């Protein structure tokens, strides 16, 4: 449980403290009001004074700083001079040991124990010298035992063997005792139960048997008992077990067992088949040779022959005599020897592989220390960060700031003179040691005078020292600076609380606060450099051991690279799409999903859409540029036609993600017409667009002609010879435009902007119609449109005149062609000019009137035309459009044309046209919507 290091006026919890033995005795005697408390966590001889002296021994108390300061300073001094007391465990229980047990806790004792255990059980370095000496002793005993069996050397070998056996008994006896004792360094072999567990190990059992046999043989020889010597000669065989104990760690047996276990299946298979061959061959040879050859009289003789033959030993004591037996022996020998020889090859290859693996493992074990060092450096660099709150990480660096307390200098010197070793006392007696003492004395002299005065006058208050070294005396060890004010205590009491007994007898205390920020920065930089050095050393140990390691590294790197490439390809597919498809697959998908829009959010789909839109825009811009250039070049002509501009027809192919709902709708006329003739437009006939411009000064008799003929020609019927004409016509490429008189001056394209207030602009115009030339293949009709915003009142005044002229046209018997304005349901977005659509009010222009009114109207509004837009925009045709008059079958002399300002569309038309006329065939003419935007 961590202690609370933040001090305060009320005194924070100081941690878990347990009453020590010496302090308990003092409390029981009643000598001092305070009782000594032991720091459970630190395990050092730190003594606290607690006011609760009546509490029992071994009780866990939650001590406070205020309670610790309640006792007097005399008891503290006596407790320091006395014995420190028993050590406490982490659970607060006192650890009491006897004098012999406390000796075992000595560091030197543990060091020697570990050293001897490593020499005997884990020999390294010069420890092999001792084991080589023991091996020579054992091998010498073996040689002398051999010579003792030879009659010529029996006497000399026996005397030498007796001396050598005495030496062996002494060496083996001492070694066995040391082994049992040094095994206590391992936690599992501590105590008498642990020692018995260690003595039951196989090699310890062998040592015990050899030692007992050697003692028995030597004791029998020294007594001269002949019968005992002859009876104990068999014990000499047990002395051969000394050779077995040479491999104390059993590495050889472990290696053999691992090889056999690794190749157990192969060995069992070879031995099983070899045993079957041995049985069958011996039995068949026995059946053949038992009558003719006395050497094979029994089946046991045949098995002996088979074993010697198949193992390729071949003593030759037994051989088959009959030819049938020899043939069987040869056949089974060829078959059986191959299986009997398999285990040798399997074990040989297994040993080779195992040895190579052990060498590689040793090479890999060399990486442990660099790896551990690297981990340690990484953690220290992390713990030394500016934002780190770690305290223990600065502990190794506090030794540089280690200073001694001046107030206890005499006592410290006295105790250190008793506890210092001879080497250290000699060093302190040297001039260098005297300089150290003088520095310590100067440190004590640099104390502030106010400190001594305050300590004598008020035992409960003391000020901080002036020097840097003495400032650490009154701070708790390894304690962070607290924002709360620290209590001011007596100097001796503070020393009793915060000072730590050093092993050399000097009381010293250094705080983390003494490490200034620049010093911490330097430590941090050093740790970072150590980290980089450790990383470089660790990388050096990662070098491949052999070619197999290189291949493994390359294969692992290749697999990692493939995984990374696959992951990268998956991400690229998610961003850009699935790449290009084959042409067949493209065609199939295009047929099945011709009008379906894909919702693929990939980058590839977006790029394709953008490319299609850019291509559409480029084609439109090219068309507009061609029109503009033609207008500039032919501006002086009397009539400029858009058909002569060679406008490329716009395809209805979907080039973007916009669709027009009109693309598949039929615009038909009213059902109230007397007769309708529906003509579906051909999909492969492209429309041409004719734009006939007139001079600036238009004649009074301006008119428009709508004449659908067999060739869909647009004709012009002038009222007089001075009339100019302005015709907007859409027809096929084969259409022709009637010649118009040359204008007086060049003219520009000026179209008045549409007005929402204009509903009907009508002028009386002679309209010629040729119903006999109407063909099913005709896809367009001529549409003429001229409008001006100044002619609103003029058009309304002529509306009554238009109706009066209709009756005169009926009397003349001329054919009247009535064109009804079409009301599209929902034009949507144009396929050809989708980005240039602007909605305007519907403008229906009806032209009627006499020559004078037309001349007067043209003179009124044409000079006031301002710069107009080049394109006629699309308008929504409302239900409140001007009603179209219907006529009977009597052919009137004149006609009236009502045209809607629907969008001029180019490209293949999928809508039907209905032309309504009177006569034998009653047709309805539906004008196609043409967008020029």
Curated annotation (Swiss-Prot):
The family annotation for this protein states: Belongs to the potassium channel family. KQT (TC 1.A.1.15) subfamily. Kv7.5/KCNQ5 sub-subfamily.
Task: Report residue spans for region: Interaction with CALM.
Answer: 371-379, 522-529
**Segments in the Cytoplasmic topological domain:** 1-126, 179-201, 254-267, 348-933
Q: State any GO CC term.
A: clathrin coat
* Tissues and organs where the protein is expressed, per its UniProt entry: Strongly expressed in brain. Also expressed in colon, lung and uterus.
Q: How does it assemble?
A: Homotetramer; forms a functional homotetrameric channel resulting in the expression of a small M-current. Heterotetramer with KCNQ3; forms heterotetrameric M-channel responsible for the native M-current. Heterotetramer with KCNQ1; forms a functional voltage-gated potassium channel. Interacts (via C-terminus) with calmodulin/CALM; forms a heterooctameric structure (with 4:4 KCNQ1:CALM stoichiometry); the interaction is calcium-independent, constitutive and participates in the channel function.
Q: Which domain of life is it from?
A: Eukaryota
Q: Domain comment?
A: Each channel subunit contains six transmembrane segments (S1-S6) with S1-S4 forming one voltage sensing domain (VSD) and S5-S6 contributing to form one quarter of an interlocking pore-forming domain (PD).
The residue spans the entry assigns to the Extracellular side of the membrane are as follows 148-157, 223-230, 289-299, 321-326
Q: What is this protein called?
A: Potassium voltage-gated channel subfamily KQT member 5
Where found?
Cell membrane
Q: Does the keyword Ion transport apply?
A: yes
Q: How is its activity regulated?
A: Phosphatidylinositol-4,5-bisphosphate (PIP2) is essential to activate KCNQ5 channel by inducing the coupling of the voltage-sensing domain (VSD) and the pore-forming domain (PD). Calcium suppresses KCNQ5 channel current through calcium-bound CALM C-terminus. Therefore CALM acts as calcium sensor that controls channel activity. Zinc potentiates channel activity in a pH-dependent manner. The activity is modulated by small changes in cell volume. Activated by the anticonvulsant retigabine. Inhibited by linopirdine and XE991.
Q: Which reaction does it catalyse?
A: K(+)(in) = K(+)(out)
A single GO molecular-function term is: voltage-gated potassium channel activity
Q: Which source organism does the UniProt entry give?
A: Mus musculus (Mouse)
- Write out the transmembrane intervals: 127-147, 158-178, 202-222, 231-253, 268-288, 327-347
